[in-house]
A protein has these predicted regions:
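Flexible loop and strand-edge segments within Gram-negative outer membrane beta-barrel domains
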Residues: 23, 187-336, 448, 458-462, ...
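Short, acidic, small-residue-rich periplasmic hinge/interaction motif at the N-terminus
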Residues: 20-60, 81-82, 122-123
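Outer membrane beta-barrel strand-and-loop segments of large Gram-negative receptors
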Residues: 338-340, 380, 386-388, 475, ...
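Short acidic/polar hinge/loop motifs at secondary-structure boundaries
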Residues: 73, 101-126
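Surface-exposed extracellular loop regions of Gram-negative outer-membrane beta-barrel proteins
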Residues: 133-134, 139-153, 252-256, 313, 410, 435-480, 501-519, 635-649, ...
Length: 694
């Protein structure tokens, strides 16, 4: 551990103190780019106020199997071996696009390296994506030709239920493109160990529940997508896409607990079974029309309708008498309908671009619920409207993007109706320092609506005298975020140092309260506020100036506080971290990933992020790729939760999936392409709300 920490500190020192001047990039510029580049004289990168633009040399293009391999080399992206998808080393949500249209992992795989022109990496997403993602990666490809691509990928553990599989095919003829995709992620673990403790005072007595449980749990997620595109260059683009998401999950748990009330000790038996499933069909229609050389109008409509079935049966009894302590039999049938519509217009001026639009999303949920309080029927409706406009341009050495929006959140349930309009401004400024360095500043303000589980009226028994429920009276949060970023890029280094500060008013906080019917309830409140500040250092170091050896690092010393509704101040300091070491040589590649989990605030609790200690490699032979790896070397995947000192209930939980310990993975993939497929520049990307299951 000491060696690991020393290595991390050494790399931090290298990032901060190393600089080099290299020759200027050769990316073409246009008079009316959305944001002109801050001058960074790097071979492969140009830094803009809200994004970085990457190109790739001949060696990188020849080694890559597909575009996904190229994107993986970006300094703040890494391959998640568990899901076999790309993610940000900084965490958060990453959205991938191909020529402006939202793309799946398989679509990125279907792009040959020779077709890649450049990659736009937005660490400050534009208005149309700002509410959906923390990072946006846009893959720009060359013009279309008639052709076809297809491929398949399968990865499986040798000693437990872990399978990732996918297949895709695309065919292009003239102005028409047809695409078909299928993916499956299966998990089936029979040895998850869970240790939980509840400790509290109630009615003058001291209670303690010490639980040990072994679960058999798993899930299967499948997706089928069919896509048709017609693109007429310089005129219009039409796309129709049908998605079908199929998801099932189950938990079968047995165990025991030691229940203590003052000096009385009882041995309890426990059982908990639960399951959930849904099938979600989604239709996505998109149309874009060039009204003139300077004007473009885009329309996007997305709709879905489906039913989610959720059951949970939990009981606890005294051993050996069999006397029941509690029985929790919950059955929830949820009918959910969602629709999203967006209209956007872009006008190009000599000085920059003006983008304006309107997006509306509406989700209606009808619930038939049988739980501890009996049977009930209730409906909720979540409506959100977003008007936005932003202008981007350049004045001398300053690059800027200034935006203003108006957001309406209207949440309605049987118990409460919440309606709020919020002004949502955003300012981004970029300034060239010299050579390969730049400074950027971004400031924004936006509301965040409560999620469906937080607003739910459902009640679930967690332990004797402990239940969990939502709060239909929650209001939206208001986040004010600021980032001041220093960037350095040369042949060996590509990193950002981000000084950040976030203030959230009416932060949604989970906490325990006294409940007259059940003892204590874990529920939600609008706390007064929260603050988070720190420095995030992220990027990559290439000691040889190529991909023979690459070290990627993310280190974030930070502090966070929550001021509860009763005035109590909760504080936590942490050092988030992530380390990736990779190597590429001819047809071989090898990667090692490591982190040290840290506790961060999550409502009334401190929770750790998922631990990682993975190594995996691949060998490429023409269209075939052979993969092998070991995940969670010497350790199970582990998740920890503990309550704060201010909590009425002292709670802790340690969750370990023993099946994952030193899990050996083997895989194979095949990817073939001939010609090029149709790609379009879609300006709008939307999706309906995820399934409500609480």
């Amino acid at each position: 551990m000491k060696k690991t920490i020393c290595s991390v500190l050494f790399l931090c020192g290298i990032f901060v103190f190393s600089q080099e001047n290299v020759k200027k990039d050769t990316i073409d510029t246009t008079k009316t780019a959305e944001i002109q580049e801050v001058i960074l004289k790097a071979q492969r990168k140009k830094q803009f106020a809200d994004k970085a633009v990457y190109t790739f040399d001949k060696e990188a293009l020849e080694k890559a199997r597909y575009a996904k391999d190229l994107i993986q080399t970006l300094p703040e992206l890494q391959l998640d071996p568990i899901e076999n998808t790309l993610k940000s080393t900084k965490g958060g949500t990453t959205l991938f696009l191909i020529n402006g249209i939202e793309a799946t992992d398989m679509q990125i795989r279907s792009v040959a390296p020779s077709e890649v022109v450049k990659v736009e990496y937005y660490d400050i997403p534009p208005a149309r994506w700002a509410t959906r993602a923390d990072v946006v990666v846009n893959l720009i490809t060359r013009s279309t030709e008639t052709g076809y691509v297809f491929g398949a990928d399968a990865r499986s553990a040798l000693n437990t239920g872990f399978v990732n599989g996918s297949a895709y095919a695309n065919f292009t003829k003239g102005k028409n493109n047809f695409g078909l995709e299928y993916s499956i992620n299966l998990r089936d673990y029979n040895n998850r160990k869970v240790h939980s403790i509840y400790d509290y005072q109630l009615d003058g007595s001291h209670y303690r529940t010490d639980e040990n449980k072994v679960d058999h749990f798993g899930y299967t997620y499948q997706n089928v997508a069919l896509r048709y595109t017609r693109a007429v260059p310089d005129d219009y683009t039409f796309q129709a896409k049908m998605d079908l998401d199929m998801y099932t999950t189950f938990v079968k748990g047995n165990g025991g607990s030691i229940f203590t009330k003052d000096g009385l000790i009882e041995e309890h038996g426990m059982l908990k079974n639960s399951s959930s499933n849904y099938t979600t069909p989604t239709l996505d229609l998109y149309f874009s029309k060039n009204l003139s050389k300077k004007d473009e109008l885009s329309i996007n409509l997305v709709g879905s309708s489906f039913t989610t079935s959720t059951t949970e049966f939990a009981k606890e009894w005294i051993v050996p008498s069999g006397i029941s302590v509690f029985d929790n039999d919950m059955n929830l049938q949820t009918k959910q309908t969602g629709i999203v519509g967006e209209l956007a217009h872009v006008h190009t001026f000599e000085a920059g671009k003006l983008s304006s639009g309107y997006r509306v999303s509406n989700t209606n949920i009808s619930n038939d619920l049988q739980n501890l309080t009996g049977f009930s029927e209730y409906s909720v409706n979540y409506l959100e409207q977003y008007f936005y406009t932003e202008f981007s341009g350049k004045v001398k050495k300053f690059n800027y993007r200034i935006g203003a929006g108006l957001t309406n959140i209207h949440n309605k349930s049987a118990e409460n109706t919440f309606d709020q309009w919020s002004f949502t401004p955003k300012v981004i400024l970029g300034y060239q320092l010299k050579d390969n360095q730049s400074l950027r500043f971004a400031s924004s303000y936006r509301p965040i609506s409560p999620w469906s589980a937080a607003l739910s009226s459902n009640i679930v028994q967690m332990a004797p005298n402990i239940v969990q429920r939502g709060n239909p009276f929650l209001k939206s949060q208001q986040m004010f975020a600021n980032n001041f970023i220093y960037s350095l890029n040369n042949k060996y280094f590509d990193f950002n140092a981000n000084l950040f500060y976030r203030y959230t008013d009416k932060i949604i906080n989970q906490y325990y309260v006294l409940d007259e019917d059940f003892g204590y309830a874990l529920t939600y409140e609008n706390a007064k506020n929260s603050q988070q500040f720190g420095v995030q250092v992220s990027g990559s170091y290439k000691p040889f100036g190529n991909n023979l050896l690459v070290a990627k690092l993310n280190v974030t010393p930070a502090s966070e506080t929550i001021r509860t509704s009763n005035g109590a101040l909760i504080k936590n300091n942490y050092l988030a971290n992530n380390f990736v070491l990779s190597s590429e040589y001819k047809s071989f590649s090898l990667q090692y990933q490591l982190n040290i989990p840290v506790y961060t605030l999550s409502g009334a609790f401190l929770t750790t992020n998922e631990n990682q200690n993975h190594i995996f490699g691949s060998y490429k032979q023409k269209e075939w790729t052979f993969i092998a790896g070991m995940y969670w070397i010497g350790m199970p995947s582990e998740y920890k939760t503990k309550s704060l000192p201010e909590s009425l209930v002292n709670y802790s939980r340690v969750n370990r999936i023993m099946n994952n310990k030193s899990m050996l993975i083997l895989g194979i993939s095949y990817d073939f392409s001939k010609g090029k497929k149709t790609n379009l520049e879609k300006k709008l990307n939307n999706s309906t709300a995820p399934a409500a299951t609480f």
